[in-house]
Amino acid sequence: MKKRLFSMWMACCAMFATAQNPYLPLWEHLPDGEPRVFEDPDNPGKYRAYIIGSHDVTYSAYCGPDIRMWSAPVEDLSRWEDEGPIFTHFVDGQWDTMFAPDLVEVKDRKTGKKTYYLYPHSRGWRRVPMVCKGDRPDGPFTPINLTDDGRSCVQGSIIDFDPSVFVEYVTDKKDPDYERGFRAYVYYGFQHSTAFELDPETMYSLRPGTKIHDYFIPASSRYGEVRDPAGTQYPALYKEQNPGDFNFFEASSIRKVGNKYVMVFSGYSGPDYGLG
C-alpha cells in the first residue's frame, strides 16, 4: 500500500510540475479557445500546444477585434507564452469583431511544405465566411477569399457561425485523393448544425461533386425540443438515436480520437449541462 501511495504521489508531483490551473494569467480573457498541436516552426522536431481564441476586451459586448494565441511546449504546459494578436481586419474605419475561430495545418505530400488556414469567424458585414492562410501557426495571416477592397467575401464563401475544420490525411495509395494527400471538412452553425466537405483548392468553398449537410446534428432552442423541420434526416445519427437528446446550440469542434470521430459542441442548457 505504501509503495502504491508513493507511486501515486510521484505521479501527482510530475503532473503538477508540467501543468497548472488556471493555465493563463487572470488578466487574460480568451474565450472560445480551440487547442491545436503543431510543430514549433523555430525548433524543428519540437511541438507546441497552441490555444487560438477570441478576445474578450470589449466589456460591453462579446469578444473583441483580434484573434489571440497562447502557446506552450507540449512537455511543459505551465510555460505559456503570449503570441499576441495573430489576426485583425480593419475596413471602412473600423475593426471587425472576431468570434470563435479555428486553425488547421495542411501539409503538401510532395514538398513537405506546411500551410496554416485560419478561420477567424469575423462578424463584419459580408465577411463572416472569411478564411486566411499563413506559413506559420502564429501568423502572419492573409485573407484568401475577400474582394480586392476587403469589404466582402467572394462567391462560394459559405462558412458561417463558429466554424470547426477537420483535416484528414490520406495514406491509401489507391485513394483518389492520395496525390493531394488530404481531405478537409467544416462544421458550423448557431441553433442549426451544418457540415460539408471543403474544396481542397480553396479551403473555403464546397468541394465540387459533394453536397452540403444542412442539418448535421439536431438543434434546439428549448431543451429536448428539436427546432429543425419535422422529418429531418440527420447523417450524423444512428437509427436508434433520439434527435431530442442532442440539443445543438453552437460552438462546433471535431477531433479524431483513435478510430472514432468526436464532435463537441455547446448544447442548449438542461439537466445534463455542465462544465468539467
Task: Name these PLM-found stretches.
Residues 19-276:
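Carbohydrate-active catalytic/glycan-binding domains of CAZyme proteins
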Residues 1-20:
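Bacterial Sec-dependent N-terminal signal peptides
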